[in-house]
């Protein structure tokens, strides 16, 4: 049985894959910091909203979660993401996201560190 925090992070990751900007923005603090290792760092909910608008490229995504670990205000989720573009070309990625909440009960995400590798 999933805990409340495990469900929260599972739903958040599903929102990322589906491009559900509303769900994503409701789940983070105003001062969110999202560090994508080897790429960009997004600081603040306004910058995150701008980045989410730029992510809708018409690709279809599926996610297979391998592990979802929570402890207190922190969580780690890893797995595979499968992407199919408009022409049918597929790409596959391995990912690991590390999360920190602003508080233990009913917290929102205030820090994300993401590692993504094309495989």
Predicted regions and their residues:
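Short beta-edge strand/loop motif at the mouth of beta-sheet-based domains
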Residues: 41-50
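A beta-strand edge to alpha-helix "cap/lid" segment located at domain peripheries
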Residues: 35, 49-119
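Short glycine-rich loop/turn motifs that provide flexible caps or phosphate-binding loops at active sites
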Residues: 18, 43, 71
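A short gly/proline-enriched turn/hairpin at secondary-structure junctions
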Residues: 33-42
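Short, low-complexity N-terminal intrinsically disordered segments enriched in polar/charged residues
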Residues: 1-26, 30
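Structured beta->alpha junctions
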Residues: 13, 40, 67-69
């Amino acid at each position: 049985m999933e805990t409340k925090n495990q469900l929260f992070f599972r739903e958040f990751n599903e929102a990322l894959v589906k491009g559900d900007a509303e769900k994503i923005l409701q789940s983070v603090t105003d001062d969110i910091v999202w560090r994508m290792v080897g790429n960009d760092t997004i600081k603040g909910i306004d910058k995150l909203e701008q980045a989410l608008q730029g992510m809708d490229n018409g690709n279809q995504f599926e996610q297979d979660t391998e592990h979802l670990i929570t402890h207190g205000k922190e969580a780690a989720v890893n797995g595979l993401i499968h992407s199919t573009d408009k022409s049918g070309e597929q790409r596959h990625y391995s990912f690991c996201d590390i999360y920190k909440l602003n508080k233990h009960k009913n917290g929102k995400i205030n820090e994300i560190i993401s590692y993504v590798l094309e495989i």
